[in-house]
């Protein structure tokens, strides 16, 4: 059994991103994995202050007192991180970006030993909109943190059943 943290960065509870996240979560849980999902658009997560408290007196803890601490608690022993978001202006939603920026205290300079894998689900109105998100995914999560890519899934327009099936297969094969 694997522990997985899923961050859903979509404000639309029935939108394409939510459908992709739900397909993953259901299949992963059916395969015996524990999935802890956070809908970051419904959480109180402030932007990083760049104060460096976390890398000084905070000893890895962020000075801000908001809902991000719930995510930090789960990241400490998770094996996989799944990021799901709609694309706005060639990048992920601001809410998910804000949460990722706050990973600075928990994942930098080094991710927890347990964290090995990552996957990303993106939805947009056009198949040409993923370049910015892909650049960040490859550079930050695969490159800098050295996580293993378990899949980068995209859906332009209405999410297709074929895409959902690919996500389900990946979840079951973990």
Segments from the language model and where they lie:
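N-terminal beta1-alpha1-beta2 submodule of the flavodoxin-like/Rossmannoid cofactor-binding fold
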Residues: 1-84, 90-105, 143, 149-150, ...
């Amino acid at each position: 059994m694997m522990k997985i943290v899923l961050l859903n960065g979509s404000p639309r509870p029935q939108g394409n991103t939510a459908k992709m996240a739900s397909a993953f979560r259901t299949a992963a849980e059916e395969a015996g994995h524990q999935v802890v999902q956070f809908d970051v658009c419904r959480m109180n997560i402030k932007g990083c202050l760049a104060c460096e408290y976390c890398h000084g007196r905070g000893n890895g803890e962020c000075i801000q007192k908001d809902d991000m601490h719930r995510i930090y608690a789960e990241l400490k022993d998770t094996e996989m991180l799944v990021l799901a978001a709609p694309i706005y202006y060639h990048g992920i939603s601001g809410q998910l970006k804000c949460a990722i920026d706050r990973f600075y205290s928990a994942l930098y300079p080094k991710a927890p030993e347990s964290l090995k894998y990552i996957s990303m689900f993106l939805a947009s109105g056009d198949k040409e909109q993923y370049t910015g998100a892909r650049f960040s995914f490859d550079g930050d999560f695969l490159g800098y943190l050295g996580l293993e890519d378990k899949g980068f899934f995209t859906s332009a327009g209405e999410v297709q059943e074929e895409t959902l099936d690919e996500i389900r297969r990946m979840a079951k094969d973990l």
